[in-house]
Amino acid sequence: MKVKATKLRIKQRRKNKGLNISRLDIIRAEMDVVPSPGLPEKVNEKSKNIPLPEGINLLSSKEIIDLIQTHRHQLELYVTKFNPLTDFAGKIHAFRDQFKQLEENFEDLHEQKDKVQALLENCRILESKYVASWQDYHSEFSKKYGDIALKKKLEQNTKKLDEESSQLETTTRSIDSADDLDQFIKNYLDIRTQYHLRREKLATWDKQGNLKY
């Protein structure tokens, strides 16, 4: 069908001019048809000025048409070689615009990177302050509530109770009445009871070691 359509188109052209159909007419007519979607429109406009391949006159009209129909893509590539460089220039400009857009995007990313780095630096500063505060708190806590501090405090309280009981014993000479004696016994027993309880705690502590949490 394509062969017949091509020949009819050529006959119509030559009929108007009073000329015969030649194989070159077939090739030019075939090259003058609308190209495939991937080929620019300028290929069709400039095809009449495209030189024919060398040795094309050795082929018959049917062979030429079959060759064109079978290898149409190669024909389009051949035609493309003779197009002006405007298409390539347009592509170059398009690529240049794309690169320019990428450059702008990169600058935006660079600014965002600087902001993120600033935030990270602030986070590092906060982390350093937190670590310093935690170390101070831990040190203060250990001084007041650590095993060593608690044991030392217990030892001091035990020693203080022993001293209080010794001082209380010195007041026995000043006891004049039964009521004073009862009060003395009550106070003395209370102090000595607390003293022995704390001594027992210290002994247990020394035996079992530091407290386990």
Swiss-Prot record:
Q: Which Pfam families match?
A: Mod_r
Where is the protein found, in the record's own terms?
Cytoplasm; Endosome; Late endosome membrane
Asked whether the keyword Lipoprotein is assigned, the reply is no
The alphabetical list of record keywords is: Cytoplasm, Endosome, Membrane, Protein transport, Transport
**Record-linked InterPro entries:** ESCRT-1_cplx_Vps37_fungi (IPR017435), ESCRT_assembly_dom (IPR037202), Helix_hairpin_bin_sf (IPR029012), Mod_r (IPR009851)
UniProt subunit comment = Component of the ESCRT-I complex (endosomal sorting complex required for transport I) which consists of STP22, VPS28, SRN2 and MVB12 in a 1:1:1:1 stoichiometry. Interacts with STP22 and MVB12.
Role played: Component of the ESCRT-I complex, a regulator of vesicular trafficking process. Required for normal endocytic and biosynthetic traffic to the yeast vacuole.
Q: Which family does it belong to?
A: Belongs to the VPS37 family.
Q: Which protein is depicted?
A: Protein SRN2
Report the source organism: Saccharomyces cerevisiae (strain ATCC 204508 / S288c)
